[in-house]
Amino acid sequence: MLFRSAPNGTGTIKVGGNYAASLVAGEIAHSKGYAAVLYLDPKEKKYLDECGPANFFGIRGNSYITPQSHSILPSITNKSLQQLAEDMGLTVERRPVPFEEIATFDEAAECGTAAVIAPISQIDDLDENKSFVIAKDGKPGPVCEKLYHKLRAIQYGDEPDTYGWISIIE
């Protein structure tokens, strides 16, 4: 089991060492055909942390669930998605998320600046030889789809920015 950050380390700060620590796990994952690595917390090794260089969130019923951790970089994209989720009527839960909870998600995704939302269709636990299929058809779920389109519409100016997120530079 490999970890991206150390307990009480620099995981919450954008520094090169945080990315370097993930290179080995990323190489192993890519050599086995995986797109990304889902990291657990470095202290108790049982709570979801983040997905490669991006934040993780899951949708279950009417809840947007994202890890609260002292070892991950806070994401502006995740924060924006949480606001949009609340505005859509979802309950936002920011808390420690046990790994086993993956089996209960209707949708899951990683989120960050580059992709905004990258849906996750399956998570494989190679240590325990378990697979969790989240998107049976491999497509984004309806909540991820709505969140993605809403945020992109605000970013591109197709919808008004009522949050003060966009600055016009002349």
Kindly give the residue locations of the regions a language model identified.
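Helix-start/capping segments and mature chain N-termini
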Residues: 1-170
